[in-house]
Amino acid sequence: MCVSRLVLLFGLLLCVGAQLSNAQHWSHGWYPGGKRELDSFGTSEISEEIKLCEAGECSYLRPQRRNVLRNIILDALARELQKRK
C-alpha cells in the first residue's frame, strides 16, 4: 500500500514538473520542427542600444545603485505625501 502511494505521488510530481518546466527551447530564428527563418541570414539587425555601447555610451552596463536607492527613497516619500493628502 505504501509503495503504490509512493509510485502515485512520484507519477503526479513528474506530470506536474513536466507541465511547469520550460522543456521546449527554441533558438532565435528557429521554429518548431527545425525550420529556420530564411530572411534572418541576409539582414543584420543591430539595435540602437548596441550601437550606443560601441560608442561608449552604455548606460545599462554602468552600476546604477545610487539611482536605484534614490528612486526608492523618492517613491517612498511620494507615497507618504499621497497618504497625508
Curated annotation (Swiss-Prot):
The keyword Amino-acid biosynthesis does not apply. The modification Pyrrolidone carboxylic acid is found at residue 24. It is found in: Secreted. This is Progonadoliberin-2. InterPro entries: GnRH, Gonadoliberin. Residues 1-23 form the signal peptide. GO terms for molecular function: gonadotropin hormone-releasing hormone activity; gonadotropin-releasing hormone receptor binding. Keywords: Amidation, Cleavage on pair of basic residues, Hormone, Pyrrolidone carboxylic acid, Secreted, Signal. Belongs to the GnRH family. The keyword Signal applies. The modification Glycine amide is found at residue 33. It comes from Morone saxatilis (Striped bass). Its main location: secreted. PROSITE patterns: GNRH. PANTHER family: GONADOLIBERIN, PROGONADOLIBERIN. GO terms for cellular component: extracellular space. Stimulates the secretion of gonadotropins. It holds the Pfam family GnRH.
